[in-house]
Amino acid sequence: MPKFYCDYCDTYLTHDSPSVRKTHCSGRKHKENVKDYYQKWMEEQAQSLIDKTTAAFQQGKIPPTPFAAPPAGSAMIPPPPSMGGPPRPGMMPAPPMAGPPMMPMMGPPPPGMMPVGHGPGMRPPMGAHMPMMPGPPMMRPPTRPMMLQSRPGMARPDR
């Protein structure tokens, strides 16, 4: 009867039967060997990718990133104001970001402003979606931690 060879463990099993293979493959040493094998394989793949990227960059096939360090002796172009960073001369610093963004105010628009998408007093057509507001998505306002509810008749220790 042919023997079964385990590539991960570099060993032959006593014989090739499903029960022997199952027992071997569920063993601690086999699992460690499989984990080590794939960990080494991933490291080799990552190093190969790094080497290929470095070679392509050195050959000029990959352009430098726009905000990378400038070559020696050249002037650096400052990033746009939306990227943050220190204020430039003559500019006011940006206000600090404190707390979550404010929730939009609901109600009629200020006088002279038209509502987004529809005329005054008009509702969107049936099945139509409301238009998206520009800007970042709004966050839920912070809430108190949820209190555990007790069953009727049980004393509440927090009161």
UniProtKB/Swiss-Prot annotation:
Places the protein is found:
Nucleus
Can you quote a single GO CC term?
A: commitment complex
SMART domains for this protein: ZnF_U1
Q: Which GO terms describe its molecular function?
A: mRNA binding; pre-mRNA 5'-splice site binding; U1 snRNA binding; zinc ion binding
Return the Pro residues bias intervals.
77-95
Entry keyword Nucleus: yes
The cross-references to PROSITE patterns, in alphabetical order and at most eight, read: ZF_MATRIN
Q: Highest taxon of the source? A: Eukaryota
Q: List the disulfide bonds.
A: none
ZnF endpoints (Matrin-type): 4-36
Record keywords: Metal-binding, Nucleus, Ribonucleoprotein, RNA-binding, Zinc, Zinc-finger
Q: Does the keyword Lipoprotein apply?
A: no
Q: Where is this region: Disordered?
A: 63-95, 139-159
Single GO BP term:
mRNA 5'-splice site recognition
| Gene3D superfamilies, A to Z | Classic Zinc Finger
Please state which protein family the record places this protein in. Belongs to the U1 small nuclear ribonucleoprotein C family.
Quaternary state and partners of this protein?
Component of the U1 snRNP. The U1 snRNP is composed of the U1 snRNA and the 7 core Sm proteins snrpb, snrpd1, snrpd2, snrpd3, snrpe, snrpf and snrpg that assemble in a heptameric protein ring on the Sm site of the small nuclear RNA to form the core snRNP, and at least 3 U1 snRNP-specific proteins snrnp70/U1-70K, snrpa/U1-A and snrpc/U1-C. snrpc/U1-C interacts with U1 snRNA and the 5' splice-site region of the pre-mRNA.
| PANTHER family referenced in this protein's UniProt entry, alphabetically | U1 SMALL NUCLEAR RIBONUCLEOPROTEIN C
Q: What does this protein do?
A: Component of the spliceosomal U1 snRNP, which is essential for recognition of the pre-mRNA 5' splice-site and the subsequent assembly of the spliceosome. snrpc/U1-C is directly involved in initial 5' splice-site recognition for both constitutive and regulated alternative splicing. The interaction with the 5' splice-site seems to precede base-pairing between the pre-mRNA and the U1 snRNA. Stimulates commitment or early (E) complex formation by stabilizing the base pairing of the 5' end of the U1 snRNA and the 5' splice-site region.
The name under which this protein is listed is U1 small nuclear ribonucleoprotein C
Q: In which organism is this protein found?
A: Xenopus tropicalis (Western clawed frog)
